[in-house]
Amino acid sequence: MQRPFEVDNSEYPFQDHWLPYRDGMIHYIDEGEGPVVVLLHGNPTWSYLYRNVIKELSGQCRLIAPDYPGFGMSKAPTGYGYTPQEHAEAVTALIEQLDLQHVVLVVQDWGGPVGLHYAVHHPDNVRGIVLMNTWAWPAKILPMKLFSMTMGGWPLGYWLQTRRNFFAHTIVPGGIHHKEKVTAALRKAYTDPFPTPALRKPTWVFPRSIRKAGPWLAEIESRLPLLAEIPAQILWGLKDSAGFPVEEMQRWQGILRMHETEALSDASHYVQEDRPDRVATSIRRVLERTNGAAKRPNTIKFTETKSRRISI
């Protein structure tokens, strides 16, 4: 299958994989060998967000980075509503179709609810968790509610996202602390997946869902105690907006009792852009803690997991 848009190969030098999903296609990256790490993005990002993490770790473990339907290079099936519930179903389908075993879930932004929905329903298949600037409960703090009402509201929020591509054009650069990293290539990579107003709707549904998906988020929250004994690395960008204050990080520390935490004073919301090196280190660490140590050339051996790849 052909890419729907071009991306700088020096930035994103990966082979494309495609998983049929209903009458759509899920695009994903599948790099490396060894213990399986699933990298989940948020809004309005895609697997490109993890490019520098994948480059650093591809010789040490197997990294799977999907694009949700309607994001990145994935094609949404007919009737797809772009809700987090549907994205969670798509991620579950991908994990099951690829037969991924004993996975590490790496989650940030909406990747938290999407990925942890899988984790709370399949805790025995989750080896570890790396968690960055996210939540998995109904929004109660005022900044998040106001953000949802503005960015996911009608008509202003809808106009901003569908007519101005506001999330990709403005919020992503604003959520990166190191401004020298906000290059023309990066801007292009995040705006190109949304060339028309109709294709930008997914970026509006996500902020709208902060309020609209309350019951679904509450169901995840009720099951979070199932994750208490899973080793976790919490990586928190302290320069993030008021929606992800330190108090939210501390809440995660109380839930994920087997956590190790690193608070980053030089990272904002998109930790993967600001500090991909620390994301990679956190993945290595959780693998070490779970006896699935990342492969180091000529020093560490591992037992390959039972899984398969699909290419079209």
Where does each model-flagged region fall?
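Conserved alpha/beta-hydrolase catalytic His-Asp/Glu region
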Residues: 162-226
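Conserved hydrolase catalytic core segment
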Residues: 101-141
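Conserved HGGG/HGGXW glycine-rich cap/lid loop of the alpha/beta-hydrolase fold
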Residues: 29-73
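Catalytic active-site module of serine/aspartate enzymes centered on a nucleophile-bearing elbow/loop
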Residues: 257-312
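Conserved loop-alpha-helix segment in the C-terminal half of the alpha/beta-hydrolase fold
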Residues: 231-267
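Active-site loop/oxyanion-hole signature of alpha/beta-hydrolase fold enzymes
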Residues: 22, 65-107, 281
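The conserved beta1-alpha1 loop
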Residues: 40-42, 108, 236
